[in-house]
Amino acid sequence: AGDEVITSAYTYTASASPAVHVGATLKFIDVAPDSFEMDYEALEAAITEKTKVIVPVDIAGVPCDYDRIFDIVERKKALFHPSNDVQRAIGRVIVAADSAHAFGASYMRDGERIMCGNVADFTSFSFHAVKNLTTAEGGALTWRPIEGFDDEYIYKQFMLLSLHGQTKDALHKNGLGNWEYDIVAPSYKCNMTDIQAAIGLVQLDRYEGLLKRRRDIIERYDEAFKTLGHLTVPHFTDRHTSSGHLYLLRIPGIGVDRRNELIVQ
């Protein structure tokens, strides 16, 4: 329908490919100078009457500047033309965060600490094998309440998309007398298994300690690099607390060829 989705150019394909799956047009925004986040001025300039979703990327586990992003979509509200009931209820460009790196991160808003997952309109997390918390594969999705929509309705839409368009999830289907179900759409198959969930629950029990250990390591790195003039990600500030997923370092005068040589060495 000509809809547009905007995301960061500095990310993994998962931030962008869902837009392609639904036939939308992608717009990539490069990072700002001396930053790992989107150039927010370029983001604002890229919004048109066709823009439906912005996908900020919480790179390395550091939350984006969501206050600035929401200010932008509010200023551009007059351009927004909703094409479904959820878009009409939200009434502006939707902010759907790629927080694959940021499970356990938090963001300060009006003096209140808000956990990542309750900042953007929708937030996706990854539990891939290399993430802080893993279920071997898979992830999770959260959303803020949408006026006029019951959470159970939103959940069911995701259930239909992730389980072949089946009208009952595995838990309800296995209840006494509940075996019968319908297929209402040719959807995907990406639901989490019980075994994966069990692994995740064990990880959750120890996750607070894992986050603390990552913070300890990052603070040691920060201390070591602070006088060298390298660009690093600000993991812990008055605005946010990172999950510490990656420690990114940009060294002046060192390009990708030298980086690759060091990795091989």
Tell where the protein language model's regions lie, with residue ranges:
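Conserved active-site segment immediately N-terminal to the catalytic lysine
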Residues: S83-L133, W179-I183, T232
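Short conserved AdoMet
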Residues: T48, H128, K226
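Active-site PLP attachment segment
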Residues: H101-F103, N118-T167, D194
